[in-house]
From Swiss-Prot:
Keyword Lyase tagged: yes
UniProt KW keywords: 4Fe-4S, GTP-binding, Iron, Iron-sulfur, Lyase, Metal-binding, Molybdenum cofactor biosynthesis, Nucleotide-binding, S-adenosyl-L-methionine
GO MF assignments: 4 iron, 4 sulfur cluster binding; cyclic pyranopterin monophosphate synthase activity; GTP 3',8'-cyclase activity; GTP binding; metal ion binding; S-adenosyl-L-methionine binding
PROSITE patterns registered for this protein in UniProt: MOAA_NIFB_PQQE, RADICAL_SAM
Protein's name according to its UniProt entry: GTP 3',8-cyclase
Gene: moaA
Alphabetized InterPro entries for the sequence: Aldolase_TIM, Elp3/MiaA/NifB-like_rSAM, MoaA, MoaA_NifB_PqqE_Fe-S-bd_CS, MoaA_twitch, MoCo_biosynth_MoaA/MoaC, rSAM
Gene3D superfamilies according to UniProt: Aldolase class I
EC id: 4.1.99.22
Catalysed reactions, as listed in the record: GTP + AH2 + S-adenosyl-L-methionine = (8S)-3',8-cyclo-7,8-dihydroguanosine 5'-triphosphate + 5'-deoxyadenosine + L-methionine + A + H(+)
Coiled coil spans: none
Positions bound to GTP: 35, 84, 118, 178, 280-282
Sequence positions that bind S-adenosyl-L-methionine: 48, 88, 142, 212
Pfam family, one: Mob_synth_C
Amino acid sequence: MTPYDDSPAQAVSTAPRTTGPSLIDGFGRAVTYLRVSVTDRCDLRCVYCMAEHMTFLPKAEVLTLEELDRLASTFVGLGVRKLRLTGGEPLVRKGFIGLVARLSRHLSSGALDELTLTTNGSQLERYASDLARHGVRRINVSLDTLKPALFRALTRGGDVTRVIAGIDAAQAAGMTVKINAVALKHDNAGEIPALIQWAHGRGCDITLIETMPLGEVDQDRTDQFLSLQDVRRDLSSFWTLTDIPDSTGGPARYVHVAETGGRLGLITPLSNHFCDTCNRVRLTCTGTLHTCLGRDDASDLRAEIRRGASDAELVDAIHLAIGAKPKGHDFQIAAAQPAVARHMSTTGG
């Protein structure tokens, strides 16, 4: 097979092997979850994510598929058990399905528990069966509204019917779909109950996310901030919400909604941070390793690869970065300007 075609990958892990819980930060937290942005490009222009007339990175600055494979596989060799591919929009990256096929070897070998992705859903109808064939069992789909006009406005031109068709295709292919919705005070606040009912009616969990101060540095994020503590209080006035003791090391805290029978996740980086149990790091499409979404601390792994670093040297660079992972983020809703001046399309959503 050619390196990144769409053929089934051999069931052999080529990740550098270590023993024990390899990636432990300075606060004793094990890093077992890697999010990898495979591209900064996207076919939508969501208002809280990127500029309308976005200037994308030169291709030379973006990791090749081979480089993405090498870095992700190195992390798997160091004990990462969950790998999430993001963007931009990952499904617009040329050769993406081939990359998924290659990375699926770590599922076959048992080195990786889960290979998944976050998508805007616009290309999902086309690629759902391929993703399922290569071992993707769960996906997250970003969907902030079901209203066609509002969806077009928030995404600057998107078609919500394509996203819904993609969700249908993913479920038909056997994948579990979770909906991610950003809570926006002036746009979808009144639609949140209906969105939850719609998701649960389709057998999908849904997670609400507070706006985070990243992205366009000239934008005031306090205007759209909607506290999910307030949302939960309002929902509790007509639904029965029961906390679910589900500790995944992630930012979401889950409740069961008795009246719909579904799960609702709440990600509250501003009103109630999630740092103490953080088990994840992010690799951007340019090879920058961010050990905290809300801090500017970073390590340039692309430079290591392109200078010809050996596997052992690459492992050392990763250990050094993980050792410097901060205790918590710098997000504060009182600060009108973003705490971190970088686009989520590059960092990975």
